[in-house]
């Protein structure tokens, strides 16, 4: 049997700030819940009062609306779906239901894949950054300063920033996956112990019955006769 040190077992299920992966997943789910709830409140207030968040074409540097009603409804539906997924992950980690964490884990994989595609696009088409910056409205903060930066340096800075984000997101994915494996393994070990205890109870007879049967089956030894 392989012996595992207590500190090794602890750090194998620990994440940032030395907390358990289950605790980290709960905190991550709550954090995503707060963010999506704030976004939902902003979208609902914008839907209730469109003039407050309305931007004209001159302000945006183009002939298009900032967000119409159809896009607003789609964004609200996505926010509601994200709140449901985050709530499922938080509840699943708290109540130790591994299946409830899967939707949140799939969302993390999808988000990581999108950011990876953005990094690949920046790397393959570096001129697309300059084109995107030119399409920004003139009132955008630091637009002229960003345009004056060397394109190669700008690409390197953006790639470094995206790389840091991808590293952090990958770490969060590993934490959630470790929490899923921990809950799955714990539930499996509980079932295994339960089945083993029942088998032991059924297979082993009571001690009194075993000694009684053994005592009746044994015959006394023959008497000793001296030569």
Curated annotation (Swiss-Prot):
The chain crosses the membrane at residues 26-46, 72-92, 100-120, 153-173. The keyword S-adenosyl-L-methionine does not apply. GO terms for molecular function: ceramide binding; kinase binding; phosphatidylinositol bisphosphate binding; ubiquitin protein ligase binding. Its main location: membrane. GO terms for biological process: endosome organization; endosome transport via multivesicular body sorting pathway; negative regulation of lysosomal protein catabolic process; negative regulation of transforming growth factor beta1 production; regulation of lysosomal membrane permeability; regulation of lysosome organization. InterPro entries: LAPTM4/5 (IPR004687), LAPTM_transporter (IPR051115). It is found in: Endomembrane system; Late endosome membrane; Cell membrane; Cell projection. GO terms for cellular component: cell projection; early endosome; endosome; late endosome membrane; lysosomal membrane; lysosome; multivesicular body membrane; multivesicular body, internal vesicle. It is a multi-pass membrane protein. It holds the Pfam family Mtp. Undergoes proteolytic cleavage following delivery to the lysosomes. Ubiquitinated by NEDD4. Keywords: Cell membrane, Cell projection, Endosome, Lysosome, Membrane, Transmembrane, Transmembrane helix, Transport, Ubl conjugation. Residues 205-222 are annotated as: Required for NEDD4 interaction. Homooligomer; upon reaching the lysosomes. Interacts with MCOLN1. Interacts with NEDD4; may play a role in the lysosomal sorting of LAPTM4B; enhances HGS association with NEDD4; mediates inhibition of EGFR degradation. Interacts with PIP5K1C; promotes SNX5 association with LAPTM4B; kinase activity of PIP5K1C is required; interaction is regulated by phosphatidylinositol 4,5-bisphosphate generated by PIP5K1C. Interacts with HGS; promotes HGS ubiquitination. Interacts with SNX5. Belongs to the LAPTM4/LAPTM5 transporter family. Required for optimal lysosomal function. Blocks EGF-stimulated EGFR intraluminal sorting and degradation. Conversely by binding with the phosphatidylinositol 4,5-bisphosphate, regulates its PIP5K1C interaction, inhibits HGS ubiquitination and relieves LAPTM4B inhibition of EGFR degradation. Recruits SLC3A2 and SLC7A5 (the Leu transporter) to the lysosome, promoting entry of leucine and other essential amino acid (EAA) into the lysosome, stimulating activation of proton-transporting vacuolar (V)-ATPase protein pump (V-ATPase) and hence mTORC1 activation. This is Lysosomal-associated transmembrane protein 4B. It comes from Rattus norvegicus (Rat). The lineage of its organism: Eukaryota, Metazoa, Chordata, Craniata, Vertebrata.
């Amino acid at each position: 049997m392989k012996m595992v040190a207590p500190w090794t077992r602890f750090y194998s299920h620990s994440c940032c700030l030395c907390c358990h992966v289950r605790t980290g997943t709960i905190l991550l789910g709550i954090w995503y819940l707060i963010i999506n709830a704030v976004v939902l409140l902003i979208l609902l207030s914008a839907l209730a009062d469109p003039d407050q968040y309305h931007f004209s074409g001159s302000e945006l540097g183009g002939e298009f609306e900032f967000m119409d009603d159809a896009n607003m409804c789609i964004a609200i539906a996505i926010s509601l779906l994200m709140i449901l997924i985050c709530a499922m992950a938080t509840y699943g980690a708290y109540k130790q239901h591994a299946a409830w964490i899967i939707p949140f884990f799939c969302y993390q994989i999808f988000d990581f894949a999108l950011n990876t595609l953005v990094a690949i696009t920046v790397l393959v088409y570096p001129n697309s950054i300059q084109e995107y910056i030119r399409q920004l409205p003139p009132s955008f903060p630091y637009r002229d300063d960003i345009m004056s930066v060397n394109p190669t340096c700008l690409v390197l800075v953006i790639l470094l920033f995206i790389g840091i984000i991808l590293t952090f997101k990958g770490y969060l994915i590993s934490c959630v996956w470790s929490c899923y494996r921990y809950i799955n393994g714990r539930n499996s070990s509980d079932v295994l112990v339960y089945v083993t205890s029942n088998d032991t109870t059924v297979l082993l007879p009571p001690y009194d019955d075993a000694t009684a049967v053994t005592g009746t089956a044994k015959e006394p030894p023959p008497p000793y006769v001296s030569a």
